[in-house]
From Swiss-Prot:
Bilayer-spanning residue ranges: 19-39, 41-61, 67-87, 88-108, 122-142, 213-233, 242-262, 264-284, 299-316
Necessary cofactors: FMN
Annotated Gene Ontology cellular component terms: plasma membrane
Protein name: Ion-translocating oxidoreductase complex subunit D
Gene: rnfD
Family in the record: Belongs to the NqrB/RnfD family.
């Protein structure tokens, strides 16, 4: 006897909660590398973002008359909080993180209808809101621990986040200094600043912060997220097309740029292993709600992000570009899906 049932006939055994937990678990290698090189601030930011995201989610659901507990347990708000905490500078003032996280949940997610309805990636909406509103604080990263002038423990990190000063009274401006007395910035920011001052890329990359493929600490952070991304691919949580297209197009664009203008462009490997490249390619751009859903569309979507990342890094006003690239690509998803929709078997071409 055959059972008669309605579609769908193929099912994914992984529920939403399981998928979200797997993605959070895959963030662990990158998070550990980030914490090793940049201190306890990232952990504090993630915890604060979790409290804010879950509280905002519960508040909006209560106002909308929707069940609160199932939505809090599905893991979507928690994942958004984790991605926000990982994306922001470790010692960003607490109220900025709360503002960005609440905006991500209330506006970027629930204004469009809630889970599965948002047009834009909520974590990246929060990031861009804060970057445009508070550019100085959003580009204030600590130097890697190996070249930092001050040792920042958990208490110091918490004190700076909530009061603006360490336990010893040092300000954020002082804590940003390296052992050579120079104020540190991310490798991408240092490169952008040096090029605007008329230096060549080779001259800029003699700076202390440049070491390895993507700069001190950043190479390991990106390797950590690459490892987590490969885990997601192995678990079939994400599709290979989006990260593959992003990394491939970014590598190709960076290679062409480096061959044509080597004095004004960093090496292709630098673009792959600096900034938010691996976090963006495997964890942010692959958001199943705001990303393209067709096989060819995912390739187009990924290529668009990769090219935009390089163009904005090279010619734009912001050192890293993943948030802008992802949001611009999100905007194009309806058109991409419409143009790349698979042909129905047996249908005639018009």
């Amino acid at each position: 006897m055959f059972n008669i049932a309605s579609a769908p006939f193929a099912h994914n055994r992984k529920q939403t909660q399981t998928l979200m937990l797997l993605v959070i678990l895959a963030c662990l290698p990158g998070f550990l590398a980030q914490s090793w090189f940049f201190g306890w601030g990232t952990l504090i930011q993630i915890l604060l973002a979790l409290v804010t995201a879950l509280g905002s989610e519960a508040l909006v659901l209560r106002l909308r008359g929707r069940p609160v507990k199932p939505a809090l347990l599905d893991g979507s708000a928690a994942l958004t909080a984790v991605l926000i905490g990982l994306s922001l500078p470790p010692l960003l003032p607490w109220w900025m993180l709360v503002l960005g996280t609440a905006f991500a949940i209330i506006i970027a997610k629930h204004l469009y209808g809630g889970l599965g309805q948002n047009l834009f990636n909520p974590a990246m909406v929060a990031y861009v809101l804060l970057l445009v509103s508070f550019p100085v604080q959003m580009t204030s990263w600590l130097p890697p621990s190996s070249i930092a002038a001050y040792d920042i423990g958990f208490g110091d990190a918490a004190s700076v986040i909530f009061t603006g000063f360490s336990l010893d009274g040092y300000s954020m401006a002082q804590l940003k200094q390296g052992v050579d007395g120079l104020t540190m910035a991310t490798p991408l920011d240092t490169l952008k600043t040096g090029l605007t001052q008329g230096l060549t890329a080779g001259e800029v990359m003699t700076h202390t912060v440049f070491e390895g493929w993507g700069g001190i600490g950043w190479s390991w952070v990106n390797l950590g997220y690459l490892l987590g991304g490969l885990f997601l691919l192995q678990q079939k949580v994400i599709n290979w097309r989006i990260p593959g297209a992003i990394l491939g197009s970014l590598l190709l664009a960076a290679t062409l740029g480096y061959l044509m203008t080597p004095d004004a462009t960093a090496t292709p490997m630098f673009h792959l292993f600096s900034g938010a490249t691996m976090l963006g390619a495997f964890f942010i751009a692959t958001d199943p709600v705001s990303a393209s859903t067709t096989p060819r569309g995912r390739l187009v979507y990924g290529v668009l992000i990769g090219v935009l990342v390089y163009v904005i890094r090279r010619f734009g006003g912001y050192p890293d570009a993943f948030a802008f690239a992802v949001l611009l690509a999100n905007l194009c998803v309806p058109l991409i899906d419409s143009l790349t929709r698979p042909k129905v078997y047996g249908a005639r071409r018009k």
